[in-house]
């Protein structure tokens, strides 16, 4: 198990910038607005051959509004989970009441853990002198660092990782987890869905749209299969995306889809499917990811025996050529169909990686050609000789014929639909390639 380092401190002391400095990437959203990192964000890191997990947290606010209190709860959970606590303060704003409160909490309640205290933004000789005042927090060795230029960070990492027991060589996993990106517009219930699955208030949830700004990874096991759930900030219409925070959050959603095997696209049952939902679905399809549509908050819809069938018909008519994507009616609140959603997503992931023998494909081709002969505008006959599957992360099939230019769009769509139906390739993009032979 990799050791977990949690960066904690009051808002706007530079926790996310230090997180990014250590990982050498813009992984957490960094902005001058206090409280921008609202949740816990975990990423793997390595220093001098030693592997670890680094956790960024929302700012610790002893008192505040509902979001601040939720951030406080998440920070306390992070502290309990961590092997090492990195307490960060800001030399430019000086030692504050909140800094002292955090210091007392750590030294009284979590004295059994490895705690390192660092003063950030120490970038000039005068600031180094100012940082000496932080000794009064009670920590014997404050580290003076700058997340912006990297000074002092190497020494801090050396000492933190040297404080841990010698790591055993990391084992290589034979069975990789299935990566599921939970995506959708703001406030459709993505975090509530993840929390209900994990059985803990892992992500900040409130009625305020956009309370989950980062993509957050959570790992769990079901039926001996490991899963990674990637929860993201909801995608908004472009006109509503402000420069800075919302831009990076939308980019995070895009990257989450890029990382996943299956995108769980969630919509609110009360509002139905909208154009923005279709943009998210198309984003996943264009990246050849598996897709499962989740109709959340189904418990809030007045219904009779025909409601679900009528609702599904309306959704599929809106989806057009993507109507092959499976959908489930769920409720994160009542937990209706939550585990069925995970089981279906796993089936889609397996469909996406399925390998079909050439003999089975050509038996299929013979039956398909007997059912529908390809027509052409020129009158010249299109002759498909055989087909095979090409090595790829999703189903890609190669057809060898006399002239690929003769292929009509409707016949291509016929073959695609028949392949998906015959080999039960539910929820996955099927790519067809035609070559002259």
Swiss-Prot record:
The gene is der. It holds the Pfam family MMR_HSR1. SUPFAM superfamilies: P-loop containing nucleoside triphosphate hydrolases (SSF52540). GTP 2 binds at residues 184-191, 231-235, 296-299. Gene3D superfamilies: 3.30.300.20, P-loop containing nucleotide triphosphate hydrolases. GTP 1 binds at residues 9-16, 56-60, 120-123. The keyword Chaperone does not apply. This is GTPase Der. Associates with the 50S ribosomal subunit. GTPase that plays an essential role in the late steps of ribosome biogenesis. Belongs to the TRAFAC class TrmE-Era-EngA-EngB-Septin-like GTPase superfamily. EngA (Der) GTPase family. It comes from Chlorobium phaeobacteroides (strain DSM 266 / SMG 266 / 2430). Residues 3-168, 178-353 form the EngA-type G domain. GO terms for molecular function: GTP binding; ribosome binding. GO terms for biological process: ribosome biogenesis. Residues 354-437 form the KH-like domain. The keyword Transcription does not apply. Keywords: GTP-binding, Nucleotide-binding, Repeat, Ribosome biogenesis. It comes from the Bacteria.
């Amino acid at each position: 198990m990799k050791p977990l380092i949690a960066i904690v401190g009051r808002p706007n002391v530079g926790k996310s910038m230090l997180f990014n400095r250590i990982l050498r990437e813009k992984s957490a959203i960094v902005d001058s607005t206090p409280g921008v990192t609202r949740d816990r964000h975990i990423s793997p890191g390595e220093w001098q051959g030693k592997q670890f997990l680094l956790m960024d947290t929302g700012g610790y606010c002893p008192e505040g509004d509902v979001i601040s209190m939720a951030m406080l709860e998440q920070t306390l959970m992070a502290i309990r989970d961590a092997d090492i606590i990195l307490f960060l303060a800001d030399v430019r704003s000086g030692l504050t009441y909140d800094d002292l409160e955090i210091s007392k909490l750590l030294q009284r309640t979590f004295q059994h853990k490895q705690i390192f205290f660092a003063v950030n933004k120490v970038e000039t000789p005068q600031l180094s002198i100012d940082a000496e005042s932080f000794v009064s927090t009670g920590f014997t060795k404050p580290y003076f660092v700058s997340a912006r230029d990297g000074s002092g960070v190497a020494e801090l990492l050396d000492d933190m990782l040297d404080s841990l027991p010698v790591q055993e060589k990391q084992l290589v996993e034979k069975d990789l987890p299935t990566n599921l990106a939970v995506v959708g517009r703001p406030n459709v219930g993505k975090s509530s869905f993840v929390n209900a699955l994990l059985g803990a208030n892992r992500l900040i949830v409130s009625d305020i749209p956009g309370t989950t700004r980062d993509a957050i990874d959570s790992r769990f096991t079901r039926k001996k299969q490991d899963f990674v759930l990637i929860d993201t900030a909801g995608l908004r219409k472009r006109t509503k995306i402000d420069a800075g925070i919302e831009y990076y959050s939308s980019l995070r959603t895009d990257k989450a889809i890029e990382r996943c095997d299956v995108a769980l696209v969630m919509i609110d049952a009360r509002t139905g499917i909208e154009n923005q939902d279709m943009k998210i679905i198309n984003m996943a399809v264009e990246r050849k990811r598996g897709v499962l549509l989740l109709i959340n908050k189904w418990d809030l819809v007045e219904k009779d025996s025909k409601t679900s069938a009528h609702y599904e018909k309306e959704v599929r008519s809106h989806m057009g050529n993507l109507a092959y994507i499976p959908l489930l009616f769920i409720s994160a609140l009542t937990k209706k169909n939550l585990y069925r959603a995970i089981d279906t997503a796993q089936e889609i992931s397996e469909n996406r990686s399925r390998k079909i023998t050439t003999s089975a494909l050509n038996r299929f081709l013979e039956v398909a050609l007997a059912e529908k002969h390809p027509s052409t505008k020129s009158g010249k006959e299109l002759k498909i000789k055989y087909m095979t599957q090409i090595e790829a992360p999703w189903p890609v099939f190669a057809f060898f014929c006399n002239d690929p230019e003769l292929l009509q769009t409707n016949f291509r769509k016929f073959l695609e639909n028949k392949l998906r139906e015959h080999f039960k390739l539910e929820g996955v993009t099927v790519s067809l390639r035609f070559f002259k032979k």
